[in-house]
Amino acid sequence: MGDVEKGKKIFVQKCAQCHTVEKGGKHKTGXNLHGLFGRKTGQAAGFSYTDANKNKGITWGEDTLMEYLENPKKYIPGTKMIFAGIKKKGERADLIAYLKKATNE
């Protein structure tokens, strides 16, 4: 499992421009991520997803996020997330540890 504090820094640097994590947080360019773990792709209420996201049909968890965050456009071709990905597995683990905590508070 990753380091939550390191993950928070990664989130602020690479994700917070487009995403919020708190309950009731607003959608920005990307969806609010609260309740992410255990939710299927393309299901955050009130966010306009591409068909690719809605139809992917996987449930978000540590393993699916580890793969997705390495190369989002490869994992979900047609996603509108314009993020290249995080190549370092340790950084992805830290980010996932943070997301697991922050999206569930």
Curated annotation (Swiss-Prot):
Gene3D superfamilies annotated for this entry?
Cytochrome c-like domain
Q: Which GO terms describe its biological process?
A: apoptotic process
What is the documented function of this protein?
Electron carrier protein. The oxidized form of the cytochrome c heme group can accept an electron from the heme group of the cytochrome c1 subunit of cytochrome reductase. Cytochrome c then transfers this electron to the cytochrome oxidase complex, the final protein carrier in the mitochondrial electron-transport chain. Plays a role in apoptosis. Suppression of the anti-apoptotic members or activation of the pro-apoptotic members of the Bcl-2 family leads to altered mitochondrial membrane permeability resulting in release of cytochrome c into the cytosol. Binding of cytochrome c to Apaf-1 triggers the activation of caspase-9, which then accelerates apoptosis by activating other caspases.
**Alphabetical UniProt keywords:** Acetylation, Apoptosis, Electron transport, Heme, Iron, Metal-binding, Mitochondrion, Phosphoprotein, Respiratory chain, Transport
GO CC list: mitochondrial intermembrane space
Q: Which residues carry this modification: Phosphotyrosine?
A: Y49, Y98
What is this protein identified as? Cytochrome c
Provide the protein's localization. Mitochondrion intermembrane space
Q: Which residues carry this modification: N6-acetyllysine?
A: K73, K100
**Can you summarize the PTM annotation of this record?**
Binds 1 heme c group covalently per subunit. Phosphorylation at Tyr-49 and Tyr-98 both reduce by half the turnover in the reaction with cytochrome c oxidase, down-regulating mitochondrial respiration.
Q: Where does heme c bind?
A: C15, C18, H19, M81
